[in-house]
């Protein structure tokens, strides 16, 4: 899950790069992210809701991805606890990614209910156009950078304790 998140963070870095070259254009998705969003958009058009299917697909893709990452962060946290590894990063990753996941639950729900995503990354539905695009591109790049860094530091702490190889658990 952490490797998946590192890849996701790189995608947000590519989005920032695209934005730097084309700040007035619609945010760009990598081809694999666009394929995922389009695939989910197909199913989203079958469900009732207010938002465009493509918008709902993109939000749902982020919700699924952030749920997978949260599960990985929880695994790091549980391994740290079981192995008695003191890692504020494992705890911090759960808190930070938990809040990030809540943001995506709210964004997805509000897109389905009202057609407009409501959350900190959308300035609570108040911005639109390039103002919104700029904020969202940078918001997600920064938030994902922080979440990824905290999770990697927590994972390294758990690895160094031997919990990933079972050494620290076997000695209990």
Q: For the regions a protein language model found, what residue spans apply to each?
A:
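Alpha-helical transmembrane segments of multi-pass integral membrane proteins
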Residues: 103-164
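Long, compositionally biased intrinsically disordered regions
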Residues: 85, 127-128, 172
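Short, highly charged, low-complexity non-transmembrane loops/tails of multi-pass membrane proteins
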Residues: 164-172
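Membrane-interfacial alpha-helical segments at the cytosolic side of multi-pass membrane proteins
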Residues: 17-21, 74-76, 110-113
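Extracytosolic (periplasmic/ER-lumenal) interhelical loops and adjacent juxtamembrane/interface segments
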Residues: 21-57, 120-136
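Membrane-interface loop-to-helix entry segments
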Residues: 53-72, 132-149
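Hydrophobic alpha-helical membrane-insertion segments
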Residues: 1-16, 89-109
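Juxtamembrane helix-break-helix junctions at the cytosolic face
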Residues: 73-87
């Amino acid at each position: 899950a952490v490797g998946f998140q590192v890849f996701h963070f790189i995608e947000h870095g590519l989005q920032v790069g695209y934005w730097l070259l084309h700040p007035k254009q619609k945010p760009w998705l990598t081809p694999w992210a666009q394929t995922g969003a389009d695939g989910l958009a197909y199913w989203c058009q079958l469900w009732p809701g207010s938002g465009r299917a493509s918008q709902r697909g993109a939000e749902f893709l982020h919700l699924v991805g952030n749920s997978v990452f949260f599960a990985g962060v929880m695994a790091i946290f549980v391994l740290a606890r079981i192995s008695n590894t003191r890692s504020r990063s494992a705890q911090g990753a759960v808190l930070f990614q938990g809040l990030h996941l809540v943001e995506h639950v709210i964004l997805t729900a509000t897109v389905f209910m009202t057609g407009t995503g409501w959350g900190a990354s959308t300035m609570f539905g108040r911005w639109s156009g390039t103002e919104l695009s700029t904020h969202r591109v940078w918001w997600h790049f920064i938030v994902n950078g922080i979440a990824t860094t905290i999770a990697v530091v927590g994972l390294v702490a758990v690895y160094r304790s031997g919990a990933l190889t079972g050494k620290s658990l076997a000695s209990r």
